[in-house]
Each structure stands twice: as C-alpha cells, then as structure tokens.
Regions:
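Feature captures the catalytic ectodomains and active-site-proximal regions of enzymes
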Residues: 1-187
Length: 187
C-alpha cells in the first residue's frame, strides 16, 4: 500500500444522551450490525448488544436479534432494534430481495416481538419504521417522508390499512417533521 484513505473522519457529536432528552428512559440498548448506528447509540448513552449472526444484510439472524431485544426489554426502558436488510436490498436495486427482506422483517421480527409483548404486565410500545427511503430504482437514499407504525396496548387504529409511503401520509399522525416522531413515540 502506498496510501491510506480514512473513511468518514469526524469528531464526537455534541448531543444529549437519550436519558437526558427522555428522563423516563433510565437504561437503554441498541442492537445493530451497522457501526454507524452503534456509534450513535453509544453517544446517546445506549449500551450496545452484540448479536451472533447479525450481518446487516438479508441473511441476518432475525431470531437472535429478536431474542436479544426481548431479553433487554426485561431490564431496559428502551431498545432500538435496527435491521439493515431492506436498505441493502435497495442499494442493490433488487426489488425481489427488497420484498423478501420486508416480509422477513414482518414475519421474523415485528410479528414475534408483538406476540411476545402484547400481554406483558408492563406495557411495551412498538414502533416500526425505516431510517430513510432507499428506492430500488435509484439505489441510494432519498428524503421523502417514510411510513411508520406505532402500537401500544389500548391504541385505537386509524383508517390506514396499508403500510407504505402514500398510505401513511393519510394516517392519524400525518407527516411528522424532524424530531416529532420520537417525541410522539416517547410520550
């Protein structure tokens, strides 16, 4: 080698911890195969939970990630479970793979978490959302509004029956901006 090319050199961000922003969160965790997400979690004061088989790709071990999240929820007030697979499929421009990863997210992560926590004595809220769009036709991140779902015991559903970018804009929350989503979720 005759040169070194550092990727994304930077500095520590000046940001409050999650507990400083949301005092009801005394202890929280992040589960991700993506170093950037783990780093943000670290600066937000969340402990990193390493999961065997977490790849950040479509072959990630959903079951181990779900098991780790459910175990953490027994002691932590907040768990951020990040699954990168559909984003990577978007970067590859592979619509069939993207559909498979979304189906896997639904059947191997969201569904099992919901089934596990829906009757817990201590109520648990669930949010499902991408961190950004990655359309297959563009193969890069875009800045359109993203769909999201919030569930907690007793919440009344709105009229939206489809989980996509268009339908979500017509949901009871409408289009949220900046930090409105996390503030709404953490109420």
């Amino acid at each position: 080698a005759n040169s070194i090319w550092p990727w994304s050199p930077g500095y520590r961000p000046q940001m409050p911890t999650f507990s400083e922003t949301f005092p009801q969160v005394k202890k929280g965790a992040v589960i991700s195969a993506v170093d950037l997400i783990n780093g943000i979690g670290y600066y937000a004061g969340l402990r990193r939970i390493a999961v065997e088989g977490a790849t950040g790709l479509y072959n990630t071990n959903y079951e181990n990630k779900v098991a780790a999240a459910l175990e953490a929820l027994k002691t932590d007030d907040f768990v951020y479970l990040h699954i990168e697979a559909s984003d990577e499929a978007g970067h590859e421009g592979d619509i069939d793979l993207k559909l498979l990863t979304i189906e896997n997210l639904d059947t191997r992560a969201v569904g099992p978490i919901y089934e596990a926590v829906k009757d817990w004595d201590e109520p648990v809220a669930i949010a499902v959302l991408p961190d950004h769009p990655t359309p297959c036709e563009l193969r890069t991140h875009t800045s359109e509004p993203i769909p999201f779902l919030i569930w907690y015991p007793g919440i009344e559903p709105d009229e939206v029956q489809v989980y996509d970018e268009v339908a979500a804009c017509n949901g009871s929350y409408g289009v949220l901006k900046e930090d409105e989503f996390i503030k709404e979720f953490m109420k």
